[in-house]
């Protein structure tokens, strides 16, 4: 069991014992440190807060800088909370968290923010088929079509699929296999793709059994 933060480096391929190419995502999981430990008596629930990376102090707000100094760690780029039951050992503020809490072959979930696509129409965003390409029409190729009748229902229903901002959603990719762990470099490689562009931050959590 384990949980950690990481930065998506990119994708590569590894070859298994059967000489099969396995697509892998490389994640820089560390250096990570515990920034706060919450308990039920004081905070109402048990959790461990983790930060990743090292950031210059002048780029961090004063309240956050005080939070990091209280834990005795350098300011990081991201913080996230995980359930205390995700960790096999008892952690304290300032404790390091490494990829060694995972094992090769283990199954994990990876959480992140998907790539932002900007404003997209209904064909790209919702896979609409678009209008007819023939019979004289000239401007209905990628139009959404009707979104509500005039007299009945005289309105557009909530949730009607239309154009809008696409991407930048919280996404969880489940059941990814840990292919390789390089503890000396804080690298973890998982089979398949994970959300977000390169250099985006993700959460890696073990699957609770």
From Swiss-Prot:
It comes from the Bacteria. SUPFAM superfamilies: Translation proteins (SSF50447). GO terms for molecular function: rRNA binding; structural constituent of ribosome. Residues 128-168 are annotated as: Disordered. GO terms for biological process: translation. The keyword Ribosomal protein applies. One of the primary rRNA binding proteins, it binds directly near the 3'-end of the 23S rRNA, where it nucleates assembly of the 50S subunit. NCBIfam families: L3_bact. Belongs to the universal ribosomal protein uL3 family. This is Large ribosomal subunit protein uL3.
């Amino acid at each position: 069991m384990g949980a950690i933060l990481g930065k998506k480096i990119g994708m590569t391929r590894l070859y298994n014992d059967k000489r099969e190419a396995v697509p892998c995502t490389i994640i820089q999981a560390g250096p990570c440190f515990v920034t706060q430990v919450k308990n039920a008596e004081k905070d109402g629930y048990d959790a461990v807060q983790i930060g990743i990376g090292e950031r210059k102090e002048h780029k961090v707000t004063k309240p956050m800088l005080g939070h990091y100094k209280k834990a005795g760690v350098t300011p990081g780029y991201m913080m996230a909370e995980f359930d205390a039951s995700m960790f096999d050992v008892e952690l304290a503020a300032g404790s390091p968290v490494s990829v060694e809490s995972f094992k090769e072959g283990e199954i994990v979930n990876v959480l992140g923010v998907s790539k932002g696509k900007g404003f997209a129409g209904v064909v790209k965003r919702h896979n609409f088929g678009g209008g007819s390409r023939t019979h004289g029409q000239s401007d209905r190729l990628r139009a959404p079509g009707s979104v509500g009748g005039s007299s009945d229902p005289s309105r557009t229903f909530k949730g009607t699929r239309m154009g809008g901002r696409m991407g930048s959603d919280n996404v969880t990719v489940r059941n990814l296999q840990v292919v390789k762990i390089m503890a000396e470099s804080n690298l973890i490689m998982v089979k398949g793709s994970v959300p977000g562009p390169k250099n985006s931050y993700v959460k890696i959590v073990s699957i609770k059994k």
